[in-house]
Amino acid sequence: MGKYYQIFFLLYLLCILYVISCGYINPYSPYSSPCLFAPIIGYLYMGGSLSSNSSNNNNNNNNNNNNNNNNNNNNNNNNNNKDSKLTENCNNNSSNNNSDNKSNIKNKQHHHHSNFRNRRGKSNNKNSSDNDDCTKCNKRHHTQSSSYDTSELHQSVSSGLGGSMGSGSQALTDIEKDINEFMNANPSHSLNKQQIQQQQQLQQQQQQLLKQQQQQQQQQQQQQQQQQQQQLEKQRKEQEETEKKKQLELQQQQQLQQQQQNGNGLIIEEDMMEGRILRNISKVYRDVNENQPKSYYDYEGYRINWKNVDRYEVIQKIGRGKYSEVFSGIDIETSDEVVIKVLKPVQKLKIQREIKILESLNGGPNIIPLLDSVKDQSSKVCSLVFPFVNKTDIRELVYTLDDYDIRYYIFELLKAIDYTHSKGIIHRDIKPLNIAIDHSKRKLSLIDWGLAEYYHPGKNYNVRVASRHYKPPELLVNMFDYDYSLDMWSLGCLFAGLILDRDPFFNGDNNNDQLLKIVKVLGTDDLFNFLDKFGLSLTDEQSSLIKPRQKSNWERFIPYENDDIAQPDAIDFLDKLLRYDPTERLTAKEAMKHPYFKDFNQSIL
């Protein structure tokens, strides 16, 4: 059997030489050479003598030796590949961690053989066979790389080296030291830490930015919600205001409609008409409208020819009234100064009446003419255009006017009133504010015809007209069939304020108090005579306020500084205007013939 073993040893030696010559194994590697020559060293150590065991034992020993050799080869290959991997990682400055380096060493250790053959210039067929071996090797070591078993490595190293290179644990610690030295010497490891820190900082910054963006979005959403709520609240308030305005407009329209119906004799309370003995009929101009065609006074069927408002330019506001606001403006086509009266939302019938009356009075003395009627098509606002008048309130001029000036302007006013009455029209709102005086030109104009009405004898009219301080007694006791004499009472109140330096002369707080103020001057005898004549009566409240009084003497109301103005003919003229009974008052024509105007009335005699 010793011969057979020698023959087997020679064959093994030849195989090793062939493997080395072919380049499959590097004999200079410190890890592979002990594995290749371990059997030879063992044979020489034993002196070439073998025990005379049975053939079966020899076969078993040979098999065990072969297995050990295979294990040693595998372990040496692993060690060799680890070394090559360490070298390759040092050259490439790998940035992987410790565990990744170990797994990469195991996964790449089997390409050492193919790389060695390539350096020797071998053919592609050999490379393909080597690749097949590497595939098998990879399959075998894939299970090993999943779990790094240090005990298996210890056994393989100790068995392969045969004790010549020390124990397996010492080899393992050497490898781990090399790996640790490599990792400590590798600068990419510290770079990885810096990169990780930078990435963490970037992530923190991104998170902060995201938080800031979210906060900004939340703030924007809150602001948008607040703005939406504010807009909704504003819209709600605007809607409430518009609804209130509409309700007020409806109420005003209903009141105006009721007043208009009362004024036209359509609705009159029956208890007020009971006991009427005599109907009031004007003693002048009573049949003017009856002698005219219906189209002359029928403002209900009158159609207004509205023109474009763009012709006029508004400059500034100069006044306001109950039913309108007044602005100064310019006629763009002629560059003339104008006055634009912007009408508030009122009953359409009232606007038609005012325009119709102004057309009827066009060209009259001291009556402001209507230039144009315009309408804004977008807003539907209606306006009346008049020539510009340098308006000065007559009350502002009272201290600059002398006796002659007062006579002159009252006479000019009577001209306008008489012309109005001659056209069958009652002004119904004569007061200082509706009299425009340009004293430098000595020009007077009667303005504001919004309450004017056509007169028809025996017709009932609305008693809610004229300003309180200039209301005649017939309006205060609800006498609906009044006539032109209403304007003459208002003129008397205005004249009393001028010559007696007391405006308003009858300064009542309400309608009943206004009647009481009149009674204190004119007494109760003439009042009761007036009421009895026309079958009128006082209300319970009026009866409780009014007590029997004598008529006052006009001279007691004259201030000493106005002796030159309040002359006897002026007092007589005033006394004939302020009468309870409308039939006893002077008409406009009669007033102009009064001796008070003897210096001016030659033209009308």
Swiss-Prot record:
Catalytic activity: L-seryl-[protein] + ATP = O-phospho-L-seryl-[protein] + ADP + H(+); L-threonyl-[protein] + ATP = O-phospho-L-threonyl-[protein] + ADP + H(+)
A Pfam family reported for this protein in Swiss-Prot or TrEMBL: Pkinase
GO MF, one example: ATP binding
Residues binding ATP: 318-326, 341
Record-annotated membrane-spanning stretches: 5-25
Polar residues composition bias: residue spans: 144-155
Catalytic activity, EC: 2.7.11.1
Low complexity composition-biased segments: 54-81, 89-104
Region (Disordered): 54-170
Residue span, Protein kinase domain: 312-597
InterPro entries xref list: CK2_alpha, Kinase-like_dom_sf, Prot_kinase_dom, Protein_kinase_ATP_BS
Subcellular location(s) per record: Membrane
Glycosylation sites: 53, 92-93, 97, 101, 127, 280, 390, 601
Family label: Belongs to the protein kinase superfamily. CMGC Ser/Thr protein kinase family.
Protein name: Probable serine/threonine-protein kinase DDB_G0286481
Protein's organism: Dictyostelium discoideum (Social amoeba)
